[in-house]
């Protein structure tokens, strides 16, 4: 069952694969993106099944609009896969589909589920959901505070600023600061009640340049890297993958796609700059890049990508950062020949 989700509605497409390996697509239906629509989906799905065989739902992670349906299906013991948009896009490019509608997208997701072996979706823990909500709230409040600071500074240096306006701007700044402190306290309380989460976050903060706020943002925005299966997929999800456009004699310079999670790219920039002052490995890596590319900006972006993939590795392997580790220096275990 492929499901294309929008803000208010979603379209479902039923399909099956026959013994001859031919794909057969059945009916499509549209439902409201509400609890009532979810119940109607299960009833409609049961009518489409010719036999009592399990149905696998394939959903694209479209913003936050898919979450209610995904949790509903999981709570009702339904098997489903939640796919990152870039994975669905790459599959669509491999097909001959040129048009794009909700119905065609639902059919495409159905076809993807029939042709590929997809990982089952595991709902994020309540702690990770709360961590993501608090991390996003903190980033939003921080950005509001930065804009308000610039606005107050500009108004203060204008001709004859109104003292009452300056006072109101100061009150707004203090309010945002109070909210930021409350969010930080909520984060501290959460980590105190979730020692396992706090322990794994400590692995990330052991990297020079990665602070607790950055570590929280990375883990929260990837929901503990649950939807990521490889370093390449992670870089693409964040928009730090390298793309190049070349045709004939026209060849553009390689650049990052920037078609990913902007929150993560924003969160990784300052840590990358900081690591170029305190992390010897990143300093050496940056120097090698600058020897080939004099412009410093691509080097900083490469350090951002390296820090992101390092966080992924430390989280998955569940161990802290080792500045002396290098894969080339590891002793290979040889298998003794059988006598």
Region roles according to the model:
Residues 1-339:
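A detector of single, family-specific signature residues
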